Amino acid sequence: MNYMPGTASLIEDIDKKHLVLLRDGRTLIGFLRSIDQFANLVLHQTVERIHVGKKYGDIPRGIFVVRGENVVLLGEIDLEKESDTPLQQVSIEEILEEQRVEQQTKLEAEKLKVQALKDRGLSIPRADTLEEY
């Protein structure tokens, strides 16, 4: 097999369906249409997939340009196995509400953790409270 270095290896994956995981945690699924030397991607017929528990919802995004430095993971989707998922698809409104509830629960748990540490005389410095020297 002949392997090309760097992002040139993605040329073989153009026009195939891919899953892209971004640095901010979002998951995109779409057809890879273009790449460049910086791994910037152009995805077509893109959907943003939101997972909460055993449910997921897809938000249509259309054509999506992704800056290469924001890509954490890029993988081709096997079209034959794509429908064999144990997850249940729900409406956009339902998955967004479940995501909001999950985020609120995590935030409350983090507040309890910080308070417990504070009660013990410990603290974790937060990024927004640190000053640059």
Swiss-Prot record:
Which InterPro entries does the protein's record reference?
Lsm1 (IPR034104), LSM_dom_sf (IPR010920), PTHR15588 (IPR044642), Sm (IPR047575), Sm_dom_euk/arc (IPR001163)
Q: Which residues carry this modification: Phosphoserine?
A: 123
Q: Where is the Sm domain?
A: 5-80
Q: Name one GO cellular component term.
A: nucleus
What keywords sit in the KW lines? Answer: Cytoplasm, mRNA processing, mRNA splicing, Phosphoprotein, Ribonucleoprotein, RNA-binding
PROSITE patterns (UniProt xref): SM
Q: Where located?
A: Cytoplasm; Cytoplasm, P-body
* Molecular-function GO term, any one: mRNA binding
SMART domains, per database record: Sm
The keyword Ribonucleoprotein is annotated on this UniProt entry: yes
GO biological process annotations for this chain's record?
A: deadenylation-dependent decapping of nuclear-transcribed mRNA; histone mRNA catabolic process; mRNA processing; negative regulation of neuron differentiation; neuron differentiation; RNA splicing; stem cell population maintenance
Phosphothreonine: residues bearing it: 129
The Swiss-Prot or TrEMBL record describes its family as follows: Belongs to the snRNP Sm proteins family.
Describe its partners and assembly state. Interacts with SLBP; interaction with SLBP occurs when histone mRNA is being rapidly degraded during the S phase. LSm subunits form a heteromer with a donut shape.
So what does this one do? Plays a role in the degradation of histone mRNAs, the only eukaryotic mRNAs that are not polyadenylated. Probably also part of an LSm subunits-containing complex involved in the general process of mRNA degradation.
Protein name in UniProt? U6 snRNA-associated Sm-like protein LSm1
Q: What is the lineage of its organism?
A: Eukaryota, Metazoa, Chordata, Craniata, Vertebrata
What gene is this protein a product of? Answer: LSM1
